[in-house]
């Protein structure tokens, strides 16, 4: 239909913009199809397409997403831009508490489902802690025996007591995948004890698998009197205080970090057995965390490039952005 109104009119100037505005209004606001608009304006569908494209090019259209997730999408974009992240996902905060770990763990599970659904073999490095445990419980059963799950840190105290955060075994079980735990103390009694552990063939084999991991996923800890690393018995009160005096605001894989994302000069670090990250992160390294107390630690890790991906909730996202 090419001999209609549009062809008889002057296609240039203000009249063309008026037609573009009308076509865009019918398409976006009234929900008409391009065929319906073509019949109403007495032009071809091809011209309707050009008119809508012109309306967009001339910025005649402004979109507003009317959904609660819109603010989460905006927060994720702001975090991505602020910290130059390779991935960021912000979920709705469904709790009135200062910590909404269940929602964040669920969101992280959706992310891992998509990543782990691939057929090609992959290795994923996993941190420890309550948030990671929540993720391992939420992941649905998947038959991926070709995938490998490797722990990035130990889960034993100096006196031999294990924690309840056996994340790697649980997640590998859900995947029907290969499991590589790290059954050593998080912090040893002495440097010599740590060096003895690192000299074992099993440690070197595990270290090689960690180096091959294409994705690292971990929680992050608050640093203070209620710090998980201290409450679970991995470090002493004196070690906690010494790191705090050195400027620690958070903990990543057992490592105390400052507000600038720098690993502080904590004495226990020379006895820490976890696989310390490179700085900046050299592969997708995702922090999954929620809570007002963790916000300074999250901001520090992202600012210091210890991690380059984040999954969190909207309240925590606001706090991290405000801290910057």
Task: Identify the residue ranges that each predicted region occupies.
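Generic hydrophobic alpha-helical segments
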Residues: 23, 104, 108-112, 135, ...
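HTH-adjacent hinge/linker in prokaryotic transcriptional regulators
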Residues: 7, 14, 51-125, 137-145, ...
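Conserved phosphate- and dinucleotide-binding cores of soluble alpha/beta proteins
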Residues: 2-24, 28-37, 42, 47-53, ...
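A generic structural motif
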Residues: 145-147, 177
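Structural beta-sheet core signal
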Residues: 126, 149-151, 181, 287
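Short alpha-helical
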Residues: 70, 130, 134, 293-296
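Short Gly/Thr/Asp-enriched flexible loops that form oxyanion-binding sites at enzyme active sites
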Residues: 131-142, 228-238
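Glycine-rich beta-strand-to-loop/alpha-helix junction loops that act as flexible
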Residues: 124-131, 290
């Amino acid at each position: 239909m090419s001999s209609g109104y549009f062809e008889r009119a002057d296609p240039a100037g203000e009249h063309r913009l008026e037609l573009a505005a009308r076509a865009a209004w019918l398409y976006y606001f009234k929900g008409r199809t391009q065929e319906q608009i073509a019949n109403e304006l007495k032009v071809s569908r091809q011209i309707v397409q050009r008119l809508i494209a012109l309306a967009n090019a001339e910025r005649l259209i402004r979109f507003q997403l009317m959904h609660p997730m819109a603010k989460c999408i905006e927060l994720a974009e702001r975090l991505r831009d602020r910290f130059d992240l390779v991935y960021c996902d912000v979920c709705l905060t469904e709790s009135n508490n200062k910590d909404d770990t269940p929602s964040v763990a669920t969101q992280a599970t959706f992310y891992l489902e998509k990543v782990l659904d691939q057929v090609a073999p992959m290795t994923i490095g996993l941190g420890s802690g309550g948030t990671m445990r929540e993720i391992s419980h939420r992941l649905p059963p998947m038959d991926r025996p070709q995938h490998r799950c490797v722990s990035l840190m130990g889960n034993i105290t100096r006196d031999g007591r294990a924690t309840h955060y056996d994340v790697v075994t649980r997640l590998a079980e859900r995947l029907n995948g290969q499991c590589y735990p790290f059954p050593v103390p998080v912090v040893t009694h002495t440097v010599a004890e740590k060096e003895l552990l690192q000299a074992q063939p099993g440690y070197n084999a595990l270290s090689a698998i960690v180096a091959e991991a294409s994705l690292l996923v971990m929680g992050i800890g608050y640093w203070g009197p209620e710090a998980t690393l201290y409450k679970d018995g991995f470090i002493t009160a004196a070690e906690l205080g010494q790191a705090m005096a050195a400027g620690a605001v958070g903990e990543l894989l057992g490592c105390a970090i400052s507000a600038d994302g720098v690993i502080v000069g904590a004495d226990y670090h020379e006895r820490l057995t976890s696989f310390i990250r490179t700085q900046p992160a050299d592969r997708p390294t995702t922090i999954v965390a929620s809570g007002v107390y963790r916000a300074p630690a999250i901001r520090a890790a992202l600012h210091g490039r210890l991690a380059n991906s984040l999954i969190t909730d909207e309240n925590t996202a606001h706090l991290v952005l405000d801290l910057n």
